[in-house]
Amino acid sequence: SSGSSDAFITKYDKNGNFVWARKFSGSDEIRGLRIAVDKLGNVYTTGSFEGTADFNPGFASNILTSSGNTDVFVSKLDSTGSYVWAKSFSGTGMSRGLGVEVDDQGNVYTTGFFQGNFDFDPMDW
């Protein structure tokens, strides 16, 4: 791992044969805690991270930086394991993403916890 721990996603076919694996790595700790797959095979994960983390498992990078505490992440990979997007949410204390679901329209829902104040829409300046 790059930091104290990295997160991974692996895909196997219905017969247990390996298809692909991807990792999220960073300067400190990344914990992948929940996964969901939509009807198109896109893969969504949530969990927590500290420090800086690269959520693009390909050749490019998408570096997210925590606010100094443990922050929430939500990410999306397509059915082939290619990066689509990743978001982070932070607050004044520790926070963690504990669940992720996708509805039939492709809307993504997350649940978790936070301490202190929390910014649910970091792009809303």
Predicted feature residues:
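A sequence-level/structural motif corresponding to short, flexible coil/turn segments enriched
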Residues: 1-125
